[in-house]
Amino acid sequence: MLIPEDDKLDDEKMINIAKKLWFIGFFFLPWVWLINILYFIPYRNSLNDKVKWYLKFSLIGFLGYSTIFMGWMGIYLVNRNKWGAFGDDISITIPFG
């Protein structure tokens, strides 16, 4: 467990933590959804159905967002030079060369 109090989490506290992490993940922070899933792994045998719902959709959100992001990164890295000025315009940093 992460902290000694974790052994004493009741269902209401678990639901509250899972819900907060799930909502925080919507602010373009999909890694928070992953943390939500990893945090509750030790409790997986005793989870409430509501917590399982948040964890299931955290996993779906994390995988979906990561797939879209990695797909975009692949397309961008392969085609940036072909796009010319547009490829440079959408860059955060413009590489030299």
Curated annotation (Swiss-Prot):
Q: Please, which domain of life does this record's source organism belong to?
A: Eukaryota
The transmembrane segments are: 56-76
Question: One biological process GO term for this chain?
Answer: Notch signaling pathway
Pfam families associated with the record = PEN-2
Q: How does it sit in the membrane?
A: Multi-pass membrane protein
InterPro entries according to UniProt = Gamma_Secretase_Asp_P_PEN2
Keyword list (alphabetical) reads: Cell membrane, Endoplasmic reticulum, Golgi apparatus, Membrane, Notch signaling pathway, Transmembrane, Transmembrane helix
Q: Where in the cell is it found?
A: Endoplasmic reticulum membrane; Golgi apparatus, Golgi stack membrane; Cell membrane; Membrane
> Which ranges sit in the Cytoplasmic compartment?
1-20, 40-55
Please list the intramembrane regions. 21-39
Q: Which residues lie on this side of the membrane: Lumenal?
A: 77-97
Q: Which GO terms describe its cellular component?
A: endoplasmic reticulum membrane; gamma-secretase complex; Golgi cisterna membrane
Keyword Transmembrane helix in the entry? The reply is yes
Q: Does the keyword Phosphoprotein apply?
A: no
Quaternary structure per UniProt?
A: The functional gamma-secretase complex is composed of at least four polypeptides: a presenilin homodimer, nicastrin, aph1 and psenen.
Q: What functional role does this protein have?
A: Essential subunit of the gamma-secretase complex, an endoprotease complex that catalyzes the intramembrane cleavage of integral membrane proteins such as Notch receptors. The gamma-secretase complex plays a role in Notch and Wnt signaling cascades and regulation of downstream processes via its role in processing key regulatory proteins.
Q: Which family does it belong to?
A: Belongs to the PEN-2 family.
Name the record gives this protein: Probable gamma-secretase subunit PEN-2
Organism of origin: Dictyostelium discoideum
Give the source lineage, highest ranks first.
Eukaryota, Amoebozoa, Evosea, Eumycetozoa, Dictyostelia
